[in-house]
Amino acid sequence: MKPTTESQQGRIDAVGRLEAAIGRPLDVVNVYHQWADDFPSASDFQFVQQGKILLISWNGNDIRSILSGSQDAVITARASAIKRLAEPVLLRWRWEMNRPNLQKSIGSAADYIAAWKHIRTIFTAVGATNVGWVWCPLATNFSATNGPSYYPGDDQVDWLCTDVYPGPTDASFASVSAEFMTWAAAHAKPIVIAEYGSESSNPDKAQWISAAAAYARGNSQIKAMVYFDADRVENGVDRNFRLEGTTGPLQAFHAMVTNTYFDQRKGG
């Protein structure tokens, strides 16, 4: 969810508004941090104190600079800070690495994998054992964008992950994620859907959300889903995924998250 004001309190308030709208606390909060950010932040600590699991989306630096060793101090500082948090954290470093517009900074798949292993080695040396490593490509055109080639290996990854967006044709969650889910079935790893959502321009947004929930219920490998409750402008186009201010979509999401299957407090 996007805060009204870009501040630590703004982030906390944004989560609180969404929780009030859906009628229950969130179990997982996806927090975004740039490469050089000092995190966990004050709002991150607050979310942990509220009993939420942090899914930290850590934006990647240029891969070549990571491999050169010039970023080791940054990596060590973040590993030490997360270790001090002393609570389980899901770490999603440089997600959507197969996205075409990221290829200049990513380099080759081999470079990406080497950087992943370099970062994880430093975290291990620091003793940040409370980290679950989340590998998260974009679901759209997973095979055509060579998504599988970026996989660091079962020994390097704790959680599989993908981001699912319907695109301009309002394609279903099932169809967009199909290639990734087929690939993931061959790996004995839990899956978190770290971002998913339908734009307000979709007249069937509520149905899309309900169908996504039904799909997840039918696939036991999916253990968590995080809705992308934000709006953003891309190439001059307003893309609004938000639930607040809607009726049908918000009701569909409320029905999903209060169902015992998705609400771990109710035994889901």
Identify the residue ranges that each predicted region occupies.
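N-terminal carbohydrate-binding/catalytic regions of secreted carbohydrate-active enzymes
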Residues: M1-P88, V176, D204-S220, F228, ...
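Conserved, mostly hydrophobic/aromatic
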Residues: V29, L91, D158-L160, E195, ...
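A cross-domain feature marking catalytic cores of carbohydrate-active enzymes
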Residues: H33, I56-G60, W93-W95, W135-P137, ...
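Short acidic, S/G/P-rich loop/turn micro-motifs used as interaction or catalytic elements
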Residues: W35-D38, N61-R64, N98-P100, T140-F142, ...
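Glycoside hydrolase catalytic-domain groove-lining segments
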Residues: A42-K52, S57-N59, D155, W159-N202
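Hydrophobic/aromatic residues located in beta-strands of well-ordered beta-sheets
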Residues: L54, V89-L91, W133, I191, ...
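Active-site cleft segment of glycoside hydrolase catalytic domains centered on the general acid/base Glu
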Residues: Q71-W159, D163-E179, A186, E234-A255
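A cross-taxonomic marker for long C-terminal extensions/tails that follow the last structured domain
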Residues: W183, A188, F262-G268
